[in-house]
Amino acid sequence: MVKHFAVIGDPIAHSLSPLMHNAGYKALNLAADYQKFQVSPEDLQEAVFGLKALGFSGWNVTVPHKETILPFLDELTEEAVRAGAVNTVKVDKGRLIGHNTDGSGFVRSLQEHMELDECKQIVILGAGGAAKGIAMALAPFGAQLCLMNRTPERGAELVEKILEGGGQARQEPWGRGEWLAQADCVIQTTSIGLKKEEYPFSLAGIRPGTLVVDIIFNPWETPFLHSAKAMGCKTVNGIDMLLYQGVNAWEFWLEDKAPVESMRKALYQALAV
């Protein structure tokens, strides 16, 4: 019996998730497929119950539905509760289980480049949905999280949530260079750079060798990463975050190890890198 999976969002045409998951199914000769569906906000409830009625085993959820889908689910995992958002749904004996693999996917990708237990200070630029998932997943590792956001109120809300969960966090003014100089890792989570625009403040003072991450992966190297590389930093884009959130979703659905390298190869080929 073929298992059906999908991703829903608006827009969705750009999604690389079907390529990644279908390559994984092919690598393991699994009877499964993965599709993408454009679902507008007003059609979300109908789509959720439609996928369930059609016998889908699970689906991913992307912008703008990660929070608005919550009322239509029967249960949330601890990761989903902590993030306050869902990017993965599993149908289990007729119940819809909401899960979040964004944060764990980011952590898994970051661990390929640094020992998180040895990291003392991490600067996170932005305080939107992506920053929230990343910050809540990083907090248990014990690093001091320094948030910088253009809208201080939103940053303050995220700091409070981290502190309530037992993590260490504070907010600093957007673009304060001295905090960049103290960071072991800097994570750029905003949309700045999608159109190849320059970052609105300088990275002057950042230490050579600092790990600098931009969760954007197209363009492959944003102006932000280009500047960091020019200053001697180790740079990483968001492609492996996409990979590992997909890998973690796969393992949540199928309760088995995903073929990581086959899924990675499909992503890299799609982006011609």
UniProtKB/Swiss-Prot annotation:
Annotated keywords: Amino-acid biosynthesis, Aromatic amino acid biosynthesis, NADP, Oxidoreductase
Tell me the enzyme class: oxidoreductase
Q: Which residues bind NADP(+)?
A: E78, G126, A127, G128, G129, A130, N149, R150, T151, P152, E153, R154, I215, G238
Q: Identify the Gene3D superfamilies for this entry.
A: Leucine Dehydrogenase, chain A, domain 1 (3.40.50.10860), NAD(P)-binding Rossmann-like Domain (3.40.50.720)
Listed binding positions for shikimate are: S15, L16, S17, T62, N87, D102
Q: Name one GO molecular function term.
A: NADP binding
Q: Which GO terms describe its cellular component?
A: cytosol
An example Gene Ontology biological process = shikimate metabolic process
Q: Where is the active site?
A: K66
Q: Which reaction does it catalyse?
A: shikimate + NADP(+) = 3-dehydroshikimate + NADPH + H(+)
Keyword Amino-acid biosynthesis listed? The answer is yes
Report the pathway entry: Metabolic intermediate biosynthesis; chorismate biosynthesis; chorismate from D-erythrose 4-phosphate and phosphoenolpyruvate: step 4/7
Q: Name one Pfam family in it.
A: SDH_C
Which EC number(s) does UniProt give? Answer: 1.1.1.25
User: Would I find Metal-binding among this entry's keywords?
Assistant: no
Quaternary data: Homodimer.
- Reported function: Involved in the biosynthesis of the chorismate, which leads to the biosynthesis of aromatic amino acids. Catalyzes the reversible NADPH linked reduction of 3-dehydroshikimate (DHSA) to yield shikimate (SA).
Similarity comment: Belongs to the shikimate dehydrogenase family.
| UniProt protein name | Shikimate dehydrogenase (NADP(+))
